[in-house]
């Protein structure tokens, strides 16, 4: 019986490189490689055993062989056998190559060229070192980005929940968006902890199911985040375009779209993976057709948001050019335009640029998707909460009540409303005395 195979020369260093950073379609973990290696070994030994049992008498030549890397079939003397690189090496290098052995009267010759050279496992390639260093820096950047975003989003979500006067449909949608960014950051940290933890092969089988569940949760959080970005775009577009827009009725539909539709697609993906591609931890998407179950809806949501972005800019430009928009109306539309220009590009429009990107643009794509994308939650929290005039007013009043022991001032807050394509301004006294009005009911941003 052959001994349990260990990773060949160069595999450990390659796995260290693979675990340097989280990537979309990242290199596999050591456990994934060992699972594939064990599957190939078991399959080879079964085929060799069936071949041995089917022979009535020994055949002269070279017997079938498992050399801990490849499965060599029986061969007659004087022949050269060619095999493609084993699957576990192709998982690491994404390159095809061939291995050769000669069958002589004395048996098999050594494999040539060496598997690490034939299959692209070059340990002296300086480009691997540069890429390794780049991925390490990238991992540090997106870890800082997700951490800072997580802190700011938690604070922003707490503020919107704490002040009842800020409770309205618009801010309810913002809360859901903040929560989706929080889940995205947390799922990324959990996934990194599972995928890039100590990969002791003894514990591979014990963590296999849990690792898949983590990947399902991670994919759900990613899709939910894109779904709520789409909801933000649909909501803003509806306020500008639809004459009679019932916000409360649409909120229920938005909740179903934001949390329900990702669950449907991720469940379909998980079931498909289980039956058609149940290999590894489900972090490698070798089957493009299965991966498009998730990738397709995400790209579609990005495309829809981009179309909404263009139409919103068209509407705002038309309103800004009309003669009726003057004074405070003009300032309001400029504020709306600035917020839109800052927010909509953050919806992930840059993904469209990299959908069919060439292989040489991978580093640029990773920088946009991971390094800059990890700060997306921070920017959204600042834009939707900390720079919001209504939020600042409520926090200022509460600060004065708690620390200055003085009655808060009574500033006049200007708000606007849209009705039948026209705009109007309303002034609201923000005093604690008397009946207070909801300061966010008629505001768009």
Curated annotation (Swiss-Prot):
Protein topology in the membrane: Multi-pass membrane protein
Record bears the keyword Signal: yes
Gene Ontology MF terms: G protein-coupled peptide receptor activity; peptide hormone binding; secretin receptor activity
Cellular component terms per the entry's GO annotation: basolateral plasma membrane; cytoplasmic microtubule
Coiled coil: none
Stretches of the chain found on the membrane's Cytoplasmic side: 164-170, 236-250, 312-336, 388-445
Signal peptide region: 1-21
List of glycosylated residues: 68, 96, 102, 124
Post-translational modifications: Phosphorylated on Ser and Thr residues at the cytoplasmic C-terminus by G protein-coupled receptor kinases (GRKs).
Keyword terms: Cell membrane, Disulfide bond, G-protein coupled receptor, Glycoprotein, Membrane, Phosphoprotein, Receptor, Signal, Transducer, Transmembrane, Transmembrane helix
Gene3D superfamilies assigned to the protein according to its UniProt record, in alphabetical order: GPCR, family 2, extracellular hormone receptor domain, Rhodopsin 7-helix transmembrane proteins
Any GO BP: regulation of synaptic plasticity
Domain of life per record: Eukaryota
Extracellular topological domain: 22-137, 192-212, 273-287, 353-363
PROSITE patterns per UniProt: G_PROTEIN_RECEP_F2_1 (PS00649), G_PROTEIN_RECEP_F2_2 (PS00650), G_PROTEIN_RECEP_F2_3 (PS50227), G_PROTEIN_RECEP_F2_4 (PS50261)
Pfam families registered for this protein in UniProt: 7tm_2, HRM
Cellular location(s): Cell membrane; Basolateral cell membrane
Family to which this protein belongs: Belongs to the G-protein coupled receptor 2 family.
Function noted in UniProt: G protein-coupled receptor activated by secretin (SCT), which is involved in different processes such as regulation of the pH of the duodenal content, food intake and water homeostasis. Ligand binding causes a conformation change that triggers signaling via guanine nucleotide-binding proteins (G proteins) and activates cAMP-dependent pathway. Upon binding to secretin, regulates the pH of the duodenum by (1) inhibiting the secretion of gastric acid from the parietal cells of the stomach and (2) stimulating the production of bicarbonate (NaHCO(3)) from the ductal cells of the pancreas.
Protein name from the UniProt record: Secretin receptor
Taxonomic lineage of the native organism: Eukaryota, Metazoa, Chordata, Craniata, Vertebrata
């Amino acid at each position: 019986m052959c001994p349990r195979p260990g990773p060949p020369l160069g595999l450990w260093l390659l796995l260290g490189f693979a675990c340097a950073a989280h990537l979309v379609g990242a290199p596999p973990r050591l456990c994934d490689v060992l699972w594939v290696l064990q599957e190939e070994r078991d399959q080879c030994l079964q085929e060799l055993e069936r071949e041995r049992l089917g022979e009535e008498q020994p055949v002269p030549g070279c017997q079938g062989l498992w050399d801990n890397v490849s499965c060599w079939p029986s061969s007659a003397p004087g022949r050269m056998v060619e095999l493609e690189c084993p699957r576990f090496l192709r998982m690491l290098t994404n390159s095809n190559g061939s291995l050769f052995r000669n069958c002589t009267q004395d048996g098999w010759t050594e494999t040539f060229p060496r598997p690490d050279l034939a299959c692209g496992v070059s340990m002296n390639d300086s480009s691997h070192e540069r890429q390794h260093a780049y991925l390490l820096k990238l991992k540090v950047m997106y870890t800082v980005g997700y951490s800072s975003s997580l802190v700011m989003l938690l604070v922003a979500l707490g503020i919107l929940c704490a002040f009842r006067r800020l409770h309205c449909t618009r801010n309810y949608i913002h809360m859901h968006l903040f929560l989706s960014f929080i889940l995205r950051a947390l799922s990324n940290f959990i996934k990194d902890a599972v995928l890039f933890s100590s990969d002791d092969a003894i514990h591979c089988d014990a963590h296999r199911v849990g690792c898949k569940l983590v990947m399902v949760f991670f994919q759900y959080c990613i899709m939910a985040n894109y779904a709520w970005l789409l909801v933000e775009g649909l909501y803003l577009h509806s306020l500008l375009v639809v004459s009679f827009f019932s916000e409360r009725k649409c909120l229920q539909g938005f909740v179903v779209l934001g949390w329900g539709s990702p669950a449907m697609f991720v469940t379909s993906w998980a079931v498909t993976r289980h039956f058609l591609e149940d290999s590894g931890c489900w972090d490698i998407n070798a089957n493009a057709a299965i991966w498009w179950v998730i990738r397709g809806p995400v790209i579609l949501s990005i495309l829809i948001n981009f179309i909404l972005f263009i139409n919103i800019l068209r509407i705002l430009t038309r309103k800004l050019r009309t003669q009726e928009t003057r004074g405070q109306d003009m300032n309001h539309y400029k504020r709306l335009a600035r917020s839109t220009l800052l927010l909509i590009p953050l919806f992930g429009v840059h993904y469209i640029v990299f959908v069919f990107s060439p292989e040489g643009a991978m580093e640029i794509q990773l920088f946009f998707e991971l390094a800059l994308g990890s700060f997306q939650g921070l920017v959204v929290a600042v834009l939707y909460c900390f720079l919001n005039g209504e939020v600042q007013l409520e926090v200022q009043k509460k600060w004065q009540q708690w620390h200055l022991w003085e009655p808060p001032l009574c500033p006049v807050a200007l708000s606007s409303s849209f009705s039948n394509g026209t705009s109007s301004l309303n002034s609201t006294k923000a005093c604690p005395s008397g009946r207070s009005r909801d300061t966010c009911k008629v505001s768009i941003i």
